[in-house]
Swiss-Prot record:
Belongs to the peptidase M50B family. It is an enzyme of class 3 (hydrolase). Zn(2+) binds at H60, H64. GO terms for cellular component: plasma membrane. PANTHER family: ZINC METALLOPROTEASE MJ0611-RELATED (PTHR35864), ZINC METALLOPROTEASE YWHC-RELATED (PTHR35864:SF1). This is Putative zinc metalloprotease Rip2. Binds 1 zinc ion per subunit. Its cofactor is Zn(2+). Signal peptide: none annotated. The keyword Membrane applies. InterPro entries: Metallopeptidase_M50B, S2P-M50-like. The active site is at E61. Its EC number is 3.4.24.-.
Length: 259
């Protein structure tokens, strides 16, 4: 495949570029706040984390779409999935707004948008790769954000680095959550092509309940504890202090300082 069609097909939308700009603005405010907890600190980290998470949702869905495009589903281009426009990834409130709200309230990287792909002609291996491409974006972002925090952490700019660490932690939670073999999630999507047809048909109706299954997982104490033990097991490889993550989460939920 030559470079020209690739450049023509992948066109970041102005909305995605705006999300990047807002993320950078939040980071700048958090950087200016230095190591002092003040209103500017809360505003900066909140913008950095929420806009940064929205950007990661776009990259996650773009990963699915771009991989499918490489395997022959060129309909993703006409549907706008290669523009990274968050409004193209299904319903803006339920698919994007709800995960952002959950981030703000609970600090969990909840699955976001979805792209509709034509994969029926693909091999089982290709279908699995398409499913895993989204979580791969979260993995890359987690390594990048936590790696930068580990390498360049400076107490003089603790507010900024706590926001970056928390955003990196959210990528880890999203990675683990998406890889669970629950119908409707990417982990099951990677496994499904290798199941026999009878099993696929039996589990197909459960896909519509994937959201509810995840909610049950997160509100059941024993399952919630198991989930976060797994998340922190992966997170600990980064060498970043969990204190930074906690501080970043508290700054993101700025209202917690008063209520």
């Amino acid at each position: 495949m030559n470079i020209r069609p690739l450049r023509q097909s992948v066109r970041p939308s102005p909305i995605f570029l705006l999300v990047i700009a807002v993320t950078a603005a939040g980071g700048a405010l958090a950087w200016i706040a230095a190591d002092t907890i003040r209103p500017l600190s809360y505003v900066g980290v909140f913008i950095l984390v929420i806009a940064g998470w929205l950007m990661s949702l776009c990259l996650h869905e773009f990963g699915h779409a771009f991989t499918a495009w490489r395997f022959g589903d060129h309909g993703v281009e006409t549907r706008g999935y290669l523009t990274l426009n968050p409004l193209k990834y299904t319903h803006p409130m339920l698919s994007l707004g709800l995960p952002v709200l959950i981030i703000a309230l609970g600090g969990i990287g909840f699955p976001g948008g979805a792209v509709y792909l034509q994969t029926h002609w693909m091999t089982a291996r290709q279908k699995s790769i398409v499913s895993l491409a989204g979580p791969a974006a979260n993995l890359v972002l987690a390594v990048l954000l936590l790696g930068l925090t580990r390498a360049f952490w400076d107490p003089a700019h603790a507010v900024f680095w706590s926001g970056i660490a928390f955003l990196g932690f959210l990528q880890v939670t999203a990675l683990v959550l998406n890889l669970l073999p629950i119908p409707g999630l990417d982990g099951y999507g990677a496994l499904e092509p290798h199941l026999n047809p009878e099993t696929q048909r039996a589990l197909a109706p459960a896909k519509q309940w994937g959201f509810l299954i995840v909610v049950v997982l997160l509100i059941t104490p024993a399952l919630n504890r198991w989930f976060f033990e797994l998340v922190y097991w992966f997170f600990d490889f980064s060498g970043v202090s969990s204190y930074l993550v906690s501080a970043g989460g508290q700054l993101t939920r700025f209202w917690s300082a008063w209520f």
